[in-house]
Amino acid sequence: MTQEVLRLKDIEKSYQDGQTKRTILNHVDLSVKEGEFVAIVGPSGCGKSTLLNIAGMMLSPDRGEVHLLGENVSQLPKQKWTRIRKEQIGFIFQNHQLLPYLKAGEQLSVLLKTKREDVEELFQELGIRNIIDQYPAKLSGGERQRVAIARAFATDAKLILADEPTASLDSERGKHAVEMIQMEVHRRNKAAIMVTHDERVLSLVDRIYRMEDGKLKAV
């Protein structure tokens, strides 16, 4: 039976904009199971990244519940969030956020304590085995982003969250990056949510949602 990895229930989030209270997320529900790759699209400022931050336990909702692997984590003390994020969630950001003084493979082996042979296997799967001993400054933008993708999949995390992973890449490299995410989601039976403006990569996901007026609507 396929396990539900993430469930967002009746999520609300508002911000104060001067004298006005602006509702960003309005009664949002979302469920993602293992092996599913979901995309969220919509204009800038519509709440996509806010929703991703709530799903990733980086931000608390004003109302609603976040369930991760069946547990209502929104009810847990905040000091437990860091441990859960580290163990259960992998992040892929717009900016790869690689440390310049660590080689590509060391971004996983040093920071995540991943065994060298496991790093080599993952890099081989992603077609970047040849750059494992290169520093980030020597890599192209596409190569740096692929290392960031490898880093997200190097742990036992069941949930992968990608925030505009193609933003700094050209069309071809952007599509390749998302193809790699898709491949690893299905191969490793992860659940993944990608926020993107790049509609050229939407054919690679299993489900698409559009954020409009604070609500999430299936496409």
Tell what function each PLM region has.
Residues G56:
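Helix-to-loop junction immediately C-terminal to a conserved catalytic motif
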Residues G64-N72:
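Conserved ABC transporter NBD signature motif
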Residues N72, R116-I131:
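Conserved ABC ATPase "signature" region
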Residues V73-G90:
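ABC ATPase NBD coupling module
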Residues Y135-L139, E143-Q145:
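Conserved ABC ATPase signature
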Residues A154-K158:
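A short, proline-enriched helix->beta-strand linker immediately N-terminal to the Walker B motif
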Residues I160-D163:
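Catalytic Walker B motif of ABC-type/P-loop ATPase nucleotide-binding domains
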